[in-house]
């Protein structure tokens, strides 16, 4: 199972949110590139990055920060937030971003996902974020009436091979991942599933690994020191 340390960006700086609430944003590190180098040193191959300003503005905002991390550290960057057009996707992939995460657009514009997967194949992932099992969009502000595994199946049907599943109620809380929902989505589709939200310590990593998931995203647990990243990578 791959470990994806997370860097969420507001105004060029690494921040964390509590349950996706922008009013709770607080800076957790001085510099994204410096933070990413720390992840590289711990043995990580990937970094999970989110353009939080982009999520709200519905367009790329902190592009240079992500490009710098990819170019300067050599880490593979998977990136989500505000990516809404083929031009956005093309721009990022041509500037060294390894994987693009399409979130809100997966529900609202599945044709774009289909087109992106056709052109970029495994470089496209879909982020499915759920509140009480129903998909939430637009920086988690809007809640839909679409059940999370139904969207996963729709995405699988258009060729998506990689899904990042977040239980919003666990995100940034250090209360443990939602194993039930992760098993449910993993059983519903043949896509690679990455768990996001709630990872607290090495026991959570071991539990996730036992569920045959593709990856786990770790954010707050790294910054708060409840998870040793090197230990997680080696687990």
What is the predicted role of each segment?
Residues 73, 77-98, 180-215, 232:
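Catalytic cores of alpha/beta
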Residues 57-78, 114-129, 174-201:
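Alpha-helix-loop-beta-strand connector modules within alpha/beta enzyme cores
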Residues 8, 39, 47, 92, ...:
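Conserved, mostly hydrophobic/aromatic
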Residues 112-119, 124, 186, 209-235:
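C-terminal helical cap(s) of enzyme catalytic domains, especially alpha/beta-barrels
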Residues 46-62, 104, 165-175:
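Glycine-rich, proline-tolerant flexible connector loops at the mouths of alpha/beta enzymes
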């Amino acid at each position: 199972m791959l470990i994806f340390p997370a860097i969420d960006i507001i105004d060029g700086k690494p921040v964390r949110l509590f349950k996706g609430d922008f009013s709770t944003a607080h800076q957790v590190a001085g510099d994204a590139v410096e933070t990413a180098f720390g992840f590289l040193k711990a043995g990580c191959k990937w970094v999970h990055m989110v353009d939080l300003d982009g999520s709200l503005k519905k367009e790329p905002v902190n592009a240079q920060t992500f490009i710098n991390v990819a170019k300067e550290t050599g880490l593979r960057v998977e990136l989500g937030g505000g990516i809404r057009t083929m031009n956005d996707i093309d721009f990022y992939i041509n500037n060294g971003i390894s994987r693009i995460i399409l979130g809100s657009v997966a529900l609202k514009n599945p044709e774009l996902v289909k087109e992106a997967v056709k052109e970029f194949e495994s470089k496209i992932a879909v982020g499915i974020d759920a509140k009480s099992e129903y998909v939430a969009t637009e920086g988690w502000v809007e809640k839909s009436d679409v059940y999370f595994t139904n969207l996963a199946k729709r995405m699988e049907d258009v060729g998506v091979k990689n899904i990042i599943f977040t239980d919003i109620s666990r995100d940034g809380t250090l209360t443990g991942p939602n194993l039930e929902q992760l098993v449910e989505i993993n059983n519903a589709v043949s896509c690679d599933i990455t768990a996001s939200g709630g990872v607290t310590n090495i026991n959570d990593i071991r539990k996730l690994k036992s569920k045959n998931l593709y990856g786990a995203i770790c954010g707050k647990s790294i910054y708060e020191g409840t998870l040793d990243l090197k230990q997680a990578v080696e687990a």
